[in-house]
Amino acid sequence: MAIIGLGTDIADIERVDKVFARSGDAFAERILAPSELVIYHSLKLKARYLAKRFAVKEAASKALGTGIACGVSFQDFIVSNDERGKPLLSLSGKAAELAESMGVKHVHLTLADEKRYAVATVILES
């Protein structure tokens, strides 16, 4: 196994909260996949959830080498959790196609948040 891609991103939770205050659910609907939106609508701390998901999706797009461009969208990256709470990242759409063409077999994700910031790192492995 070899590392094919690595991406990291940090998001300012206060900044995301300001965007959320201006645009309401429109920002969430632009970046979240349908399964993530279900969770988002059930939460009180929506900005924190959005900031973490935004950081993950940016980190994943950097690991792919595309950014959010070349047909890759925020909704191509879907965050879920296993039964112990470990974050999992799955790819769909153009992101999945690119990952397959690059030989990606494993996707690793870690994310954290503290007061004002959310950070995520994604590793793509063969």
UniProtKB/Swiss-Prot annotation:
The gene is acpS. Mg(2+) binds at residues 9, 58. Keywords: Cytoplasm, Fatty acid biosynthesis, Fatty acid metabolism, Lipid biosynthesis, Lipid metabolism, Magnesium, Metal-binding, Transferase. GO terms for molecular function: holo-[acyl-carrier-protein] synthase activity; magnesium ion binding. It catalyses: apo-[ACP] + CoA = holo-[ACP] + adenosine 3',5'-bisphosphate + H(+). It is found in: Cytoplasm. The keyword Cytoplasm applies. This is Holo-[acyl-carrier-protein] synthase.
